[in-house]
């Protein structure tokens, strides 16, 4: 664990979580602090919405407020963003790209070691394909297609076609703020999105369970 006290006078600290025992790491890091702000670098740890809420609970318990989360893990970025936190995805060359809900910027794609990062809405007729995981900051409109060898993660609405685990990986998953696809595929399984609207404030996740694709909220508690 590394702790970098950026401004102790104003109780602004930055910490890095390095192990699966991140909750205890965080408790030890903020011990002795009362009120202030904290920036968390969770590295490659895969944090769910439930995990992020636990981080917030621990910090709030001593009056600390999380101002941002940095990570190399796309799932953690989607989880933090879904809960309204500032999130920064670490790409190649130690560059952090801020995750925002404003998609008016020009589209751009960047390839990380195990991730294709795309910023911008995919429109009808457009195809985004990669052998690794794909993270999209924007909507996938009807008529657009996403094909990934790994997971598909969308900070936006999935209204087109998405295929995760295209080489047969049935452990792959598809996550979005709203899953209403024309077609959903994981490995060799096919499904359509539900008609019901998602619960407010919750991302949705599609996985294979008992040989069928199941869509459920990414629970925050």
Swiss-Prot record:
Family named by the database record: Belongs to the MinC family.
SUPFAM superfamilies given in the database record: Cell-division inhibitor MinC, C-terminal domain (SSF63848)
Subunit structure: Interacts with MinD and FtsZ.
Domain of life (superkingdom): Bacteria
GO biological process, one term: cell morphogenesis
Protein name in UniProt: Probable septum site-determining protein MinC
HAMAP family from the UniProt entry: MinC (MF_00267)
Biological source species: Prochlorococcus marinus (strain SARG / CCMP1375 / SS120)
Transmembrane segment boundaries: none
Gene3D superfamilies: 2.160.20.70
Sorted UniProt keywords: Cell cycle, Cell division, Septation
Record function comment: Cell division inhibitor that blocks the formation of polar Z ring septums. Rapidly oscillates between the poles of the cell to destabilize FtsZ filaments that have formed before they mature into polar Z rings. Prevents FtsZ polymerization.
Pfam families: MinC_C
């Amino acid at each position: 664990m590394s702790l970098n006290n950026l401004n102790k006078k104003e109780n602004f600290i930055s910490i890095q979580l390095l192990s699966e025992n991140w909750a205890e790491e965080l408790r030890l890091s903020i011990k002795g602090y009362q009120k202030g702000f904290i920036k968390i670098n969770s590295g490659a740890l895969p944090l769910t919405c439930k995990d992020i809420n636990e981080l917030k609970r621990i910090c709030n318990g001593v009056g600390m407020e999380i101002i941002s989360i940095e990570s190399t893990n796309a799932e953690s970025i989607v989880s933090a963003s879904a809960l309204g936190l500032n999130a920064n995805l670490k790409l190649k060359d130690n560059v952090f790209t801020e995750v925002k809900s404003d998609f008016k910027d020009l589209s751009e794609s960047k390839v990380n070691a195990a991730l294709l990062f795309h910023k911008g809405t995919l429109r009808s007729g457009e195809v985004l394909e990669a052998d690794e995981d794909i993270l999209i900051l924007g909507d996938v409109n009807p008529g657009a297609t996403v094909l990934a060898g790994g997971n598909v993660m969308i900070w936006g609405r999935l209204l087109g076609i998405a295929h995760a685990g295209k080489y047969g990986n049935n452990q792959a998953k598809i996550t979005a703020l709203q899953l209403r696809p024309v077609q959903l595929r994981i490995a060799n399984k096919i499904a359509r999105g539900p008609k019901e609207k998602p619960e407010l404030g919750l991302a949705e996740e599609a996985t294979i369970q008992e040989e069928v694709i199941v869509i459920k909220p990414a629970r925050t508690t």
